[in-house]
Each structure stands twice: as structure tokens, then as C-alpha cells.
């Protein structure tokens, strides 16, 4: 479910590690107080533990929160380490993260704009 989550307008990741003992209220408070964002929007917020092998997702669904949890059996997420920062992800970056890749792919093909024929 988390790998192909498409219900949210935006996806934010909390960079660095988060204490995953926090539940819905603790994570929602973190979103509001530390990142100054509104958790009651159509947004998926992702948090990663210290070992980077598990993540939690917080999502508001019109009448209540959904708390998602995923633990990898092997490997680790390529999670940005800078503390107290939140980043918005593009759909492509979200797919990369769920596939175990870094969200910043310097060698990825960039979209071409302003084409003309010769």
C-alpha cells in the first residue's frame, strides 16, 4: 500500500531520524510545531527511524488520521540525514524512495523543454 500510495496531493519527508515510538498525536504535533505545516490536509508525511529500515506515514483522510508503518526485511531506506528539515517530494522521488534509491538522482534524465526543429 505504501509503495503505490497515490491519494495525497503532496508527500513530505522529515529528514533525519524520528523517534518512531511516536503515534498519531506525536507525529501530528511534530508536523505542526517543528515543520509549521498543517497535518489536516491531503498530504502524506513520512518519518524514518534511526536504523533507516522502517518508516511511518501519517495521512489525514477527511474524518481521521491513517498511520502507516513499513519495516524492510532487508536493506535500508536512502533517507536524507539533515536534521529538523522537511522536504516535499515529486511523484518520481517518492517512487525512488520506495524502491530503495536516493531521492536526489543527479544522473537521471531531466525533462526537455523549449524544443524546436532544425
Regions found by a protein language model. Give the residues of each.
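Polybasic/polar functional segments that serve as interface/processing modules
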Residues: 1-118
Amino acid at each position: 500500500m505504501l509503495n503505490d500510495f497515490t491519494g495525497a496531493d503532496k508527500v513530505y519527508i522529515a529528514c533525519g531520524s524520528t523517534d518512531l515510538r511516536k503515534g498519531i498525536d506525536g507525529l501530528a504535533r511534530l508536523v505542526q510545531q517543528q515543520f509549521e505545516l498543517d497535518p489536516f490536509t491531503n498530504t502524506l508525511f513520512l518519518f524514518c527511524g534511526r536504523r533507516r529500515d522502517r518508516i511511518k506515514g501519517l495521512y489525514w483522510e477527511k474524518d481521521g488520521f491513517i498511520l502507516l508503518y513499513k519495516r524492510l526485511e532487508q536493506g535500508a531506506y536512502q533517507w536524507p540525514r539533515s536534521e529538523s528539515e522537511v522536504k516535499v517530494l515529486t511523484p518520481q522521488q517518492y517512487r525512488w524512495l520506495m524502491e530503495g534509491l536516493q531521492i536526489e538522482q543527479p544522473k537521471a534524465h531531466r525533462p526537455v523543454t523549449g524544443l524546436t526543429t532544425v
